[in-house]
UniProtKB/Swiss-Prot annotation:
One of its GO terms (molecular function) is hormone activity. Promotes spermatogenesis and ovulation by stimulating the testes and ovaries to synthesize steroids. PANTHER family: GLYCOPROTEIN HORMONE BETA CHAIN, LUTROPIN SUBUNIT BETA. This is Lutropin subunit beta. It is found in: Secreted. Glycans are attached at N13. InterPro entries: Cystine-knot_cytokine (IPR029034), Glyco_hormone_CN (IPR006208), Gonadotropin_bsu (IPR001545), Gonadotropin_bsu_CS (IPR018245). The gene is LHB. SUPFAM superfamilies: Cystine-knot cytokines.
Length: 118
């Protein structure tokens, strides 16, 4: 049997960016995020029932890690926390921990020139 054309929901490594308006440097770092295909059902006939939310690839288990932005002035917290995916599943989107919009062709990027971090 043929598998799906797109990889199923799983943790993958991704390079993200962290910056703060008050700090002069943007850092790029690598973490694991949830990404991939989630099977969904589409109603063939219009129904009187409300639409069923489509499942998204989201965190099942995660931990948080932190990095320090260099060069922040006194009084500005230089620490930035980010999620690290330990496992993923297809489920409802939780806006508290996930970006539920359409996938991006480009990763999140810095507004200023990035400096490699972790």
């Amino acid at each position: 049997p043929r598998g799906p054309l797109r990889p199923l929901c799983r943790p993958i490594n991704a390079t993200l960016a962290a910056z703060b308006z008050a700090c002069p440097v943007c850092i790029t770092f690598t973490t694991s995020i949830c990404a991939g295909y989630c099977p969904s059902m589409v109603r063939v006939l219009p129904a009187a029932l409300p639409p069923v939310p489509z499942p998204v690839c989201t965190y099942r288990z995660l931990r948080f890690a932190s990095i320090r932005l260099p060069g922040c002035p006194p009084g500005v917290b230089p620490m930035v926390s980010f999620p690290v995916a330990l496992s993923c599943h297809c489920g409802p989107c939780r806006l508290s921990s996930s970006b539920c919009g359409p996938g991006r062709a480009z990763p999140l990027a810095c507004b200023r020139s990035p400096r490699p971090g972790l």
